[in-house]
Amino acid sequence: MMDATKYHVGYYPPPVEPGHVYEWTKKDHIEKAPAWCSVDLRDGNQSLIVPMSLDEKLEFYDMLIKIGFKEIEVGFPAASETEYEFLRKLIDGNRIPQDVTVQVLTQCRDHIIRKTFEAVKGAPRAIIHFYNSTSVAQREQVFKKSKEEIKQIAVDGAKLVKQLSEEYEGNFLFEYSPESFTGTEPEYAVEVCNAVLDVMQPTPDRPMIINLPVTVEMSMPHIYANQIEWCSNHLKYRDSVILSTHPHNDRGCGVADAELAVLAGAQRVECCLFGNGERTGNVDAVTLAMNMYSHGVDPKLDFSNMPEICATYERVTRMHIYERTPYAGQLVFAAFSGSHQDAIAKGMAYRKEHNEHRWTCPYIPVDPHDIGRTYDADVIRINSQSGKGGIGFVLEQNYGYNLPPKMREALGYKVKSVSDHSHKELSAGEVLHIFEDTFLNRRKPLNVIEAHFAQVNGITATVTLDLNGQRKVVTSVGNGRLDAVANAIQSATGMEFHLENYSEHSLDEGSTSRAASYVGLTWGDGTVTWGAGTDTDIIVAGVKALVSAINNK
């Protein structure tokens, strides 16, 4: 039995007057991408069951650069020899591009700060990210120190960082985080940050990063946005401060925290690919960037080859990307439902017919092609829940067959029956096989061996039939070639049907292209049967379709 009485609200709203209206609430979308800092190689790596090897970290680092990250936290060099060695590999091997800045993490502890500067020596550019925890819980339970004592830890750390930055050659930027910010009183967090800023003395030309992390997610996202806006308005040197956010996902709202924080004044986001990180993970860089992209905002990150990024990530981290992960999961564009498939197929057709550049396709928020996914393999998926629209779409996209709507419906029943009985999803190839087996070029028990036409009293057809192994030649007249053949078959067999539907189209391009024909027949008892035929001769294709429809009775 769960006991909710042991919990309470653990966050601290900003000290504002009742009725105060925050400016961020007047905005409805992000207009410009923030600066991005990948923390995959630190926060992400430290949370892996098996941390990445040196070679794996190098491969991941190269991928982050290819995606477009300009700031990359490469580790906590004082924490382990692997992290130290990795940083030196980047520096000594000249693997830091001119437009990329590496970031290193250090606690506000004397020997760790000194070790960090040793590790980063010679880097063309580096962000020294120092931090200490400021939350009520950490002050009382972990450090057992007063507010003044905790603030002094931050100030002493800042003084040493500034001193060492003058002793070591290098192009350094600085970042300070009041760790566990979400469990800290906002006014106290600002007090500590301002004390650090007074030491560092940033300028517009040499700004400092103040990072307000969601170390543990403790509130609804709008509370965090309120805290960000209030702190932004009360920080000193505001024109010389880059306000950063670092959300975790404990309550499942990491993306919302980051998005609302940007609306509230955050200029920078620290994040991980696919939400990797401690506990429930850091905020997902992919979701954040693609959300902006879907609103027409260039995120400045390139996920145009999502399958390759996913494959590299899974191989190097040994983590699995959940199938429903936004934008990246295997099933995020997949439609199994018949009504969804029908709407998507019609949306795709509308886009093609109207040469529409703007993406408005139902059920699919971004064009799968933009991130390296395909319509045929990723969008329309066939199982027992699928409908005629999706099944027809699969045949058309993969094999060029554009079935009449009623024929799609007939095929749909057959496909759904097969999927239902086999309890599995069907591939495009399996759908094609069902179509061919059921409707295409069926030649038993009736087959037309040959047909000759003359224009006498309309069209006269002389048809050689094979019915159950018995050949017969019959002549009949019709309004057209197919009508004449249909009349000949009825005359020879005593069958009664009406040619209800006929359509055709080219399957290929060029002078030797194949044609596909579709025939629907209505019989005396009211039933309707369908057939399809293909041939380089459009007349032959039509006759094959007619024969297939008859044989489906």
Where are these regions (language model features)?
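Mixed-charge, glycine-accented linear interaction segment located at domain edges/termini
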Residues: T527-W530, T534-K553
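Short beta-alpha connecting loops at secondary-structure transitions
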Residues: L212-V214, I242, E270-E278, M290-D302, ...
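Positively charged, aromatic-enriched nucleic acid-contacting surfaces
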Residues: A461-L465, L507-W530
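A mid-to-C-terminal "edge-of-domain" accessory segment
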Residues: M2-R42, G296-T475, S511-R514
